[in-house]
A protein has these predicted regions:
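Conserved phosphate-binding/catalytic region of the ribokinase-like
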Residues: 1-5, 152, 206-323
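Glycine-rich phosphate/adenosyl-contacting loop at the front of the ribokinase-like
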Residues: 1-76, 115, 323
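Active-site metal-binding loops of divalent metal-dependent hydrolases
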Residues: 12, 136, 165, 261
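Conserved N-terminal subdomain of the carbohydrate kinase-like
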Residues: 50-133, 314-323
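Short, electropositive alpha-helical surface patch
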Residues: 62-75, 180-187, 213-216, 248
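Glycine-rich phosphate/pyrophosphate-binding beta-alpha loops
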Residues: 89, 135-139, 294, 300-303
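Conserved beta-alpha-beta core of the PfkB/ribokinase-like small-molecule kinase fold
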Residues: 138-214, 221, 231-232
Length: 323
């Protein structure tokens, strides 16, 4: 038996999210712990799974805050390294009236980029059922090598590999370089979670199914999930395509972490049920639960510390079924 259900590698940072205005009319920002891979793990931990994180923060106030935050929510932080020279990565999140957002990163460099392959905790990866990663840990040479080394260990250990590109164009030297690394990820995963705009950017196809077919012609990925924001989500598995509508909320504040919450719930379903012989009914159940969880997180500031409980997700499902 492996010790962990899911181990993730990547960025752990502070998301400064707008939280009203001061008496002088200046914007107030709240320092929320964030970073896609840890958001995914936080959702999984909330649902009772054993998780661990591999990454790097600075030896500074924010780095300590982040280590405390992930430990507090139950993520094993033994693979989290500290950089004495480089500060913890920061992101300013600008939220639009509809809850969508834009990011400005303070990462030139940031501690998350400084992880090297010698710092990878092999034991964590060898002891996990699922290994999850994104592309923020592939933007620069050193951390890219660390990510590829972690993928190699995961493959050798027989872990299922999950990939969410989580494209952030400002962090790349060029979008061609970003595409090259996304394609590397596609070549090494069995579960792909990709957003609607990412699939259009990557494949040049406006139609999501045509985009998935483009990917499938090149890579053998058993389970592909497309998150479509206000349109819901789709799962592509073998010959099946299942689409589930979203659970739209009147009181949406921001969408930060919604895709990560969705991804965490998908991995939860795979941890519970495996990936063999999933029927359309299974895929529908998986997407419905994941959409509901993502919907709940849009009503909250931040993500990592405030992931919904199983009960909150079930209550929303019951409430909507009664409407």
């Amino acid at each position: 038996m492996k010790k962990y259900d899911v181990v993730a590698l990547g960025e752990l940072l502070i998301d400064f999210t707008e939280n009203g205005k001061s008496n002088q009319g200046n914007p107030l920002f709240e320092a929320n712990p964030g970073g896609a891979p840890c958001n995914v793990l936080a959702m999984l931990t909330k649902l009772g799974h054993k998780t661990a994180f591999i990454g790097k923060v600075g030896e500074d106030f924010f780095g300590e805050q982040l280590r405390d935050a992930i430990t507090e929510v139950g993520i094993d932080a033994s693979g989290l390294c500290t950089d004495k020279e480089i500060h913890t990565t920061l992101a300013m999140v600008h939220t639009y009236p509809d809850g969508d957002r834009d990011f400005s990163f303070y990462r030139n460099p940031g501690a998350d980029m400084m992880l090297n392959k010698e710092e990878i905790c092999e034991e964590l990866i060898k002891e996990t059922k699922i290994f999850h990663f994104g592309t923020l840990s592939m933007t620069h040479e050193g951390v890219r090598e660390a990510t590829k080394e972690a993928i190699r260990i995961a493959e050798e250990s027989g872990a299922t590999i999950s990939f969410d590109p989580n494209l952030r164009p400002p962090l790349w030297n060029s979008l061609d370089e970003a595409k090259e690394q996304v394609l590397y990820g596609l070549g090494h995963c069995q579960i792909l979670k990709i957003s609607d705009n990412e699939i259009q950017w990557l494949t040049g196809e406006e139609d999501y199914t045509a985009g998935v077919n483009w990917i499938r012609e090149r890579y053998q990925i058993p389970l592909i999930l497309v998150s479509m924001g206000k349109e819901g989500s789709r799962a592509y598995y073998n010959g099946s395509i299942v689409e589930v509508k979203p659970f739209l909320q009147k009181n949406t504040i921001e969408t930060t972490g919604a895709g990560d919450t969705f991804c965490g719930c998908v991995l939860h379903y795979i941890c519970e049920h495996g990936m063999e012989d999933l029927k359309e009914e299974n895929l529908k159940d998986m997407l419905t639960f994941a959409n509901a969880a993502a919907s709940v997180i849009t009503t909250r500031k931040g993500a990592l510390r405030v992931m919904p409980t199983r009960e909150e997700i079930q209550n929303l499902l019951i409430e909507r079924a009664a409407e």
